[in-house]
A protein has these predicted regions:
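An aromatic- and histidine-rich active-site surface loop
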Residues: 20, 85-106, 110-121, 325
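A charged, aromatic-enriched C-terminal amphipathic alpha-helix characteristic of glycosyltransferases
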Residues: 268, 328, 341-375
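Nucleotide-sugar-dependent
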Residues: 212, 262-269, 276-298, 305-314
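Membrane-proximal helix-turn-helix segments that form the acceptor-binding/catalytic region
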Residues: 73-74, 100-104, 132-152
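Conserved acidic donor-binding segment of nucleotide-sugar-dependent glycosyltransferases
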Residues: 318-329, 337-344
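Conserved donor-binding/catalytic core segment of Leloir-type glycosyltransferases
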Residues: 194-222, 232
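Carbohydrate-associated surface elements
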Residues: 158, 180
Length: 376
């Protein structure tokens, strides 16, 4: 009975996407460490927020968001008392609604910010000018949101330093928990699924946002024409226009583009690949984050080529299964594949040590320690 009474309870509150890998990994990790999770959730966002939405759909999503808050507030007050309430990304508006009510109940707010909307919209995707009204508004909203949260969680130390400097925060307010991967969705590759043909498969998947560096991958594929490599590119998004134009203008026999694959099927494509690609963008954000795909590649035990950065160095260094290259450098990407081609032609598993540090249980223990410190 005493053990049941001492079990920590956390309220997960807001309009987050429950299928987002970050959310699933943190929730699973906490539960595996004995934490009870109570969910107060209204579905607003989903896969379309990461690809393309029509203007009507964007307006509809915003309207749904505002209409959801009365129910979420009611849920907050009727939910059992928790040691902390967690707000996941995209949780900017959630914080503004939750903050006054959290003060009434005396509950600690932990914001898993994950990304800066200001950085993403203004500097990474360049959807509005620096110094413009939209930029100042987004900065102001995030500045205030950072002060509403009692603790902010980010995915890398480099990202945490950016938040501290940009939004003028004390460093001790920000904690770091890596993204991790779902081993049930991205299990280790087995020899029977591995590509054993004469074709050497270089795999990239993503939503073609600037930090992915799709232009670098296409330039590398062009430079590698005539070599026995197939570049399999899965996905679509903001920068797929270059890929469409490339395939329309030239007969690229070494590129296979698959616009969409179900999330659950990505692992099968990774099984067949000789090497998987991370990111190659040269934006500031690309240097501060380690994207989901890198953790998923590590979880599969597959060889990885990605851009070098302060963020990735927090987790990885070069070895037989990892090559780090300068950002936006197509020639370096081609040379990296050439250098490792003979090794990666054969079946090997890599990243044994680091895999243990990206499991949900490991990350959940870090999150639990953070919550216990806040509680004490």
């Amino acid at each position: 009975m005493a053990e049941a009474q001492s079990r920590m309870r956390v309220l997960w509150w807001g309009t987050y996407d429950p299928e987002n890998p970050r959310v699933k990994i943190l929730q699973q990790g906490l539960q595996s460490n004995g934490v009870e999770i109570v969910r107060c959730h209204r579905a607003i966002w989903g896969a379309q927020t990461k690809t393309q939405m029509t203007r009507f759909l964007k307006v509809w999503k915003i309207l749904r968001c505002f209409c959801s808050y009365p129910r979420l507030v009611f849920c907050f007050f009727t939910a059992p008392k928790s040691e902390a309430v967690v707000v996941s990304h995209l949780g900017l508006l959630d914080l503004f609604v939750l903050w006054p009510f959290s003060r009434v109940r005396g509950v600690t707010i932990v914001w898993d910010a994950f990304i800066s909307l200001y950085d993403t919209v203004i500097f990474d995707r360049k959807m509005a000018p620096e110094g413009g009204v939209a930029a100042r508004l987004l900065w102001g909203l995030e500045y205030l949101a950072c002060r509403m949260a009692d603790c902010i969680v980010l995915d890398t130390r480099a990202h945490a330093d950016y938040f501290a400097q940009t939004f003028r925060l004390p460093p001790e307010k920000i904690k770091v928990i890596h993204v991790g991967a779902e081993p049930s969705v991205f299990p280790l590759t087995t020899a029977e699924h591995f590509n054993d043909t004469e074709e050497f498969i270089v795999l990239f998947y993503g939503t073609f946002i600037p930090l992915h560096g799709i232009d670098t991958i296409l330039d590398a594929a062009r430079l590698a024409e005539g070599l026995p490599w197939k570049w399999v590119i899965i996905g679509k998004g903001q920068k797929d226009g270059r890929l469409r134009a490339e395939l329309a203008a030239h007969q690229r026999g070494n590129i296979e583009w698959i616009p969409w694959v179900d999330y659950s099927e990505l692992s099968l494509w990774m099984d067949r690949a000789n090497v998987c690609l991370g990111i190659f963008g040269d934006t500031g954000k690309a240097a501060r984050v380690i994207p989901n795909k890198v953790f998923q590649i590590l979880s599969k035990g597959k060889p990885l080529i990605t851009r070098d950065s302060p963020a990735v160095r927090e987790l990885l260094s070069e070895n037989e299964g990892v090559v780090l290259i300068p950002p936006a450098d197509a020639k370096a990407l081609v040379e990296a594949v050439k250098k490792k081609q003979s090794l990666w032609k054969e079946f090997h598993l890599y990243h044994k040590v680091v895999r243990e540090k990206i499991l949900p249980e490991y990350l959940g223990k870090q999150f639990l320690n953070l919550l216990q410190i806040r509680k004490s």
